[in-house]
Structure formats: C-alpha cells, structure tokens
UniProtKB/Swiss-Prot annotation:
Belongs to the Mrp/NBP35 ATP-binding proteins family. InterPro entries: Mrp-like_CS, Mrp/NBP35_ATP-bd, P-loop_NTPase, YlxH/NBP35. GO terms for cellular component: cytosol. Homodimer. It comes from Saccharolobus solfataricus (strain ATCC 35092 / DSM 1617 / JCM 11322 / P2) (Sulfolobus solfataricus). ATP binds at G52, K53, G54, G55, V56, G57, K58, S59. Binds and transfers iron-sulfur (Fe-S) clusters to target apoproteins. Can hydrolyze ATP. Residues 1-17 have a biased composition (Low complexity). This is Iron-sulfur cluster carrier protein. The keyword Methyltransferase does not apply. It holds the Pfam family ParA. Although the second Cys residue of the CXXC motif is replaced with Asp, the protein has Fe-S carrier activity, suggesting that individual cysteine residues in the CXXC motif are dispensable for Fe-S cluster binding.
Length: 296
C-alpha cells in the first residue's frame, strides 16, 4: 500500500440514494417565509437600528428609542438579533428572565412600558457562553424570532442589528416584508463616519428607507456650569448627514449615569427621565413617529 495520504482510493459501492424532491424543500422554505409574513402583517412599523461599526452605543439607542416610543402610548416590541453581543435585555432591565412557549409559539419577555422583548441572551445557559454560529444558522434564528414569536398586534417593532452590513442585516432586509426603514447610529469620529456611510449605502442597495442618523456621544454638558464640550469634535454627525442626504434625528449627549445604569441592568430612560439624554430620546422618538406615520 502506498504511503501517500492523498492517494485516491477506489470508492466502495454505495447504495443508491433517492434524489431529494426539491419541490418539497421549496414548499418548506415558502411555509417558513409565509409564517414570518403573517406575523409581521400585525405590526404596523418595522424599524432596524444599525451601525457601521461596534462601540457606538447602538443597542443603547435601540433600547431607549423603544422606551421613548412606548412612552407615547404605542405598543412596541424589540428583537435583538445581535447574536454575538446581545445587550438589549440588560439595558431594558429584564436580563435573567426566560422565554416561554405554548402551542401558539414563543412568548416574549415583557419589559418596561409593556415592551415585548426577544433576545438570544434569554436562551444562553451562562453569561460567558459564546454564540458560535455561521450565517445560515443565524438566518434560521432570525426567521424563528420573527415568525415563531407571539408578537401580537404592535405599532412598532425595533430590530437591534449587529454592527456592519453582514448576514444579519441582509437577512432582515430580505425577511421583513415592507420594512419601514433603518435608523443609523454613529459617534462624532472620522472612523465611525466612514463606517456609517457604508451602512447608508447598504440601505440604499437593498432599497430600504433611511429614517435618519442618531449621533450618540455627541457632546458633554458640564453639570456645574452647563457648558457644552464636544469631546470628539463638533458638528461631524450633522455634516455627514448633509453630505449623504439623510436626516439627523438627534444628538445624544455623553452622561456618566448612562454607564452606571447599564452596568446595573437598569433602564436609563426610566431611572433618569428628566435627564438631557432622556429628553433627547423623546425628541428622536417624536421625529421617527412623525416620519413613519405621516407616510401612511
């Protein structure tokens, strides 16, 4: 016998396999997609929150935007499809709870203002358990989160997406029928601005409306004298929005109490309702509501 490990061996005769009936496979795929369509039909507005890069506070914006919209009396849900870094449950103060299921499907966790929350974080056995999934598995999980969850009738579904324009963003654009649009999160830095331009061009590539840009960490207001400091530079978000022909929805200030609330797993919007940050989220929510509901 040759010692060459790459030598081609004569294959043993294999029993004949029946070819797969691709028509049945296609029917199964269509059935899953139809389930998503049926669930999404009961939701008036579906908004994806995206960012070109990580570390810009996208999930913080998603969570507080959801609370600000819900505070107006509208019925809101939020689905966290940032599988590798799910943080929405902690920011909404519902971390550690579990998803339940019945014969109708998966029941979401109920958060502040009655917000329906779904996240992979509810399914992980430990805090440090990684999610090691390829694109196809993530696509299937997104289908489940959209089609198997008992969302009921909602006014808004906020979709917290991972950074970048990869598999999850493409899956959402393909799976969510009549997606209302994207809110894009940035910070006032050149690196983030470049990444955001890619997100804007991605949205245009998949023919999805851009509702506007939120500039997070925009400035710092000194609590002693009220003076405003632009730590990362002034006017970068506004300039970029003008260059790309999109709306600047708002500029969220830096606030040390944001980190304190997030670390404690307490919803910032609830804990500090009178803060400049919470008031800015109310302004952003008001703009989003006017943009999407005036286009009915």
């Amino acid at each position: 016998m040759s010692s060459n490990p790459f030598r081609i061996q004569n294959p043993q005769p294999q029993p004949q396999r029946q070819p797969r009936d691709l028509r049945k496979v296609n029917q199964q795929v269509q059935a899953v997609d139809l389930k998503v369509q049926m669930k999404m039909k009961n939701i008036k507005y579906k908004i994806g929150v995206v960012s070109g890069k990580g570390g810009v506070g996208k999930s913080f914006v998603s969570s507080n935007l959801a609370m600000a919209i819900a505070a107006s009396g509208r019925k809101v849900g939020i689905v966290d499809v940032d599988f590798h870094g799910p943080s929405v449950p902690k920011m909404l103060g519902v971390r550690g709870q579990m998803l339940t299921a019945d014969d109708k499907g998966i029941n979401p966790v109920i958060g502040p203002f009655g917000i329906k929350v779904v996240s992979i974080d509810f399914l992980l056995p430990r805090d440090d358990t990684p999610v090691v999934w390829r694109g196809a598995i993530k696509h299937s999980a997104i289908k489940q989160f959209l089609g198997d969850v008992n969302w009921g009738e909602l006014d808004y579904l906020i979709i917290d997406m991972p950074p970048g324009t990869g598999d999850e963003a493409l899956s959402i654009a393909q799976l969510v029928p009549g997606i209302t649009g994207f809110v894009i999160v940035t910070i006032p830095s050149e690196v983030s601005t470049l990444a955001v331009k890619k997100s804007i061009n991605f949205a245009r590539t998949v023919n999805t409306k851009i509702l506007g840009v939120v500039e997070n960490m925009s400035h710092f207001v000194c609590p002693s004298d009220g003076k405003v400091y632009y730590i990362f530079g002034e006017g970068k978000g506004k300039k970029m929005a003008e260059e790309m022909g999109v709306d600047l929805l708002g500029q969220v200030p830096l606030d040390p109490s944001i980190a304190e609330a997030n670390d404690a797993g307490e919803p910032f919007f609830l804990k500090h309702p009178d803060s400049p940050t919470s008031k800015e989220f109310l302004n952003i929510a008001d703009k989003v509501i006017k943009i999407v509901e005036s286009n009915q």
